Swiss-Prot record:
InterPro entries: Arg_biosynth_ArgJ, ArgJ-like_dom_sf, ArgJ_beta_C. It catalyses: N(2)-acetyl-L-ornithine + L-glutamate = N-acetyl-L-glutamate + L-ornithine; L-glutamate + acetyl-CoA = N-acetyl-L-glutamate + CoA + H(+). Disulfide bonds: none annotated. It holds the Pfam family ArgJ. The active site is at 197 (nucleophile). The gene is argJ. GO terms for biological process: L-arginine biosynthetic process; ornithine biosynthetic process. This is Arginine biosynthesis bifunctional protein ArgJ. The record marks 123-124 as: Involved in the stabilization of negative charge on the oxyanion by the formation of the oxyanion hole. HAMAP family: ArgJ. The record marks 196-197 as: Cleavage.
Amino acid sequence: MAVNFPSIDPAQLHPVAGVTLGWAEANIRKPNRKDVLVISVDESATVAGVFTENRFCAAPVIVCREHLAKVRAGGAGIRALVVNTGNANAGTGEPGLVNARETCAELARLAGIEPAQVLPFSTGVILEPLPIDRLKAGLPAALANRKAANWFDAAQAIMTTDTLPKATSRQVTIDGHTVTLTGISKGAGMIKPNMATMLGFLAFDANVAQPVLDTLVKEVADRSFNCITIDGDTSTNDSFILIASGKSTLPAITSTDSPAYAALRDAVTEVAQVLSQLIVRDGEGATKFMTVQVEGGKSVAECRQIAYAIGHSPLVKTAFYASDPNLGRILAAIGYAGVADLDVDKIDLYLDDVLVAKAGGRNPAYQEEDGQRVMKQSEITIRVQLGRGDAQATIWTCDLSHDYVSINADYRS
């Protein structure tokens, strides 16, 4: 029940020079579906990532962090990524780590690279052993299937409860040079800031030094995947990866102070925001896409704190599902967000262009039918003005429906 989900034409997903993708059906959890993905990158590439902040992080997340640390310490660069769906390899203890490392070793053997040059990713059911033999058996087919144009198939290969594959692509001009950016993502539940059950892979052909890419991935994640919430749960497996293949004619970006870096950051952020918003639009059972804007704060942090209190609230989300203008729930969420010195008498609340609350109380001119008119729309903006500064923050969320319960109750059946 995706909300205004754009039609994705596979032909419009630009290949990124130096990146190939292959998939296989390995029967990890269900038969006859793509469930293994291999992404290969040329030696010229640099790779960086950010991962879940869940302390119960999955085995592949641990291994990814280890392998990227070796790259930063001067080791050989990352040459391949491998993803399986249907099983999260989380809550699996030492055997899970063994399986994640064995996956890397097997792919490295087949591809003629080192195990530490492979990053593993898993998504699916937690607390179940990874069927390592099936995963390994699928790797040769995925390698043989690699093509530069396989982005749409790759998006399909990483889906779990997603109803639609998520992908987008751009070409931009930086200092007179064309840069191609293409990315895929997955996720429909267990989504909140600081990553969630979400995978995102975004490649572009610019040449970016490793320390610069490490900064870029954090800045981009903070403006995109860390600005979405569906149900407030944070998963064990979430990962967001940037791949800079180095094949563009754009001169190498070696400093975050350069104009080229700023232009690239803006382009990558735009693509990442589309990928993250597609996750919200395909949120489990979602019928409405909501933008929460908090303005006039003392800091971005407090604006986000309030925005997430609104976006996480089951009472707010169910009110929007029902188109019920019980909008005191939003004020309550603002109040419990934890901003200690908030002056509620300065707060204004808008639904789109409708002023609901003014100076901390109901706007005398507000009519409930005006609020309901907005809430019946499929796309809604909740705007809060705090009246205490110039900072602002925006997040994206969705409503909470009966179908959300059904999807998650039936997930393992």
